[in-house]
Amino acid sequence: GVLAAASAEPRATARNYIRALRGKGVEAIDLRVTIGNVDRRMREEALVEQIAALRTIILTGGNQIRLVESLLYRGDVTPLLMAIARARSAGAMIVGVSGAASALSGFMIGGGTSYEALRFGIASDMGRHGLVIQEGLGFFGTAIIDQKLSSSRRLGRLAVACAEEGVRYGLGLLEDSGVIANHDNSQLTAIGTRGAVLVEIDPLKTELAGDDFIAPDTRLCFAGPGDVIDMAAGTVTRLAPATDSAAALDTLVAELIKDCVGSAGPVTAPGVTQEAHIALRYRSNGDGTGYLDIESIRDRHG
């Protein structure tokens, strides 16, 4: 079943998915649930039972807020979301694509850049600068999920989200990549072309008092294609070479630091502005893991 509620063009998106699946010999149906019709569709008992009996449910990409507001209609759990939960309990696979992957978490990142998250913290509303966090669908409570980690420099906002919500782990998915979780989300196998990053916050060292945000020894662990993440231990069993993972992680962190702090170095050169409110220091272990020290002085009026 294809649920394209996250898409701005749900009918067209669902058709594209169904066409692609049929090209692989897989039959699929458009569940035809959108934010515009969910108040009516969630009352259709036949649809609810149809969803509960599905073996695979694909939540297409798009705006994750639109998806969540369709299944948690006006803040309430809909019969449609309960039907998806029933299907999952019976062994169905739930596939979250792009933004829909973020919606699978208990806490969902809905907006904001890494710089805004570090500089302003959690936004009080969508109209302000900062990190937007909303309730997610809760199918993947093990970690907060974020995606497009490289192109959008989202590693920083993922770390801030975990620290702010007291969630130990964050899972960042790189472009054209994902993870396959086992039945209880305790083991994740990285798939695709690039991989994923496991972010681990140390709650005993994290400080959120006043305008200061301090998260030292934030552990980063890169999982390349085929690597298996153990969510209980926070470790990775590697199939891909550690040297490749180390290079990929070091590049991600370097891009984040350049994006949020700049490249002026310890001394500000003439005509170059260095961010005075954010400090990021990274210690690479050379094996696809490392530690990121995060400090920022926040402006609460963003």
Question: What are the residue ranges of the model-derived segments?
Answer:
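Functional beta-strand-loop-alpha-helix junction segments that form "active/interaction loops"
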Residues: 7, 23-47
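Hydrophobic/aromatic beta-strand patches that form the interior of the parallel beta-sheet core
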Residues: 1-3, 29-31, 95, 171
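Catalytic nucleophile loop
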Residues: 58-61, 83-108
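C-terminal and late-domain segments of enzyme folds
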Residues: 8-15, 19-23, 110, 115-302
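Short beta-strand segments
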Residues: 3-4, 58-60, 172-174
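Glycine/threonine-rich flexible loop motifs
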Residues: 64-77
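A short, aliphatic-rich alpha-helical micro-motif
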Residues: 51-52
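Solvent-exposed loop/turn segments at secondary-structure junctions
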Residues: 6-9, 35-38, 63-66, 99-104, ...
